[in-house]
Amino acid sequence: MKKKITAISLCAALLAIAIVGASLAYFTDTDNKTNTFTVGNVDIDLIEQQRGKEGLEPFQQNKKLYPIVGSAQGEKDQYGMPIAKNYVDKVVAVQNKGSEKAYIRAYFAIPSALDDGYENFTAGQNVLHFNFGKKVENDTITSTEGKEWIWKHDDKWNYFETTMGGIRYNVYYADYYQAVDAGETTEQFVQGVYLDKSFDRKDGKCYAFGKEIKLDDGWNWNAVQCPVFAVACQAEGFDNASEAMTAAFGANYNPWGGTATNWQ
């Protein structure tokens, strides 16, 4: 079967919230690609990068996806990133641009049709894979998953499902392991995505692992999105990120709004 090109658009948005006193309402900060509105002392910036000729550079949208050639778990470069062909860089970190320490939580959403989520969570069955962040110290590469970014609780993924624009998404989220000082930036949250080598398109249908992929109504391969979202809360008065986020946003907070199910 002939492999075909698939285009993907990876988008990001972020929201921050600050608690500045018992008698005051929550303040928010919103940042996107077109405008910025800031009130209060918490201000975060969602940083997206990719590899360039002179190091990491700002991320460019609308990447073309091909089935990966090689292994994303194989040989790495100086950034701790795979050298496998057709790997798509998506290096995400969060900077605290405010004046106060802040707890940070980040969310990564992937179309449910391309992800083996609830209840099995079998990564080997994902059509579109994503890699956790990495860091390189003294030529040693380590994952930020479970260390700097806490993706699980009680050995379960921080996870829920929601719908955006008529497309179902599996959402994974993680808390940064400590409050981030003013002016500091987290380690990498995620590092990139890649299309499984088994992916193919034939006669107007899509397949992976020898099976047809069941796509949502209205699916458009030229406008696939993996939204990234970050929230932050002033650290003062809280012992950890989970406590801060629950107090600021409430339990089971869906940053994109709408109905969310299969929380764990």
Region locations from a protein language model:
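Surface-exposed, hydrophilic segments of mature proteins
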Residues: Y26-Q264
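Membrane engagement elements in two modes
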Residues: K2-T38
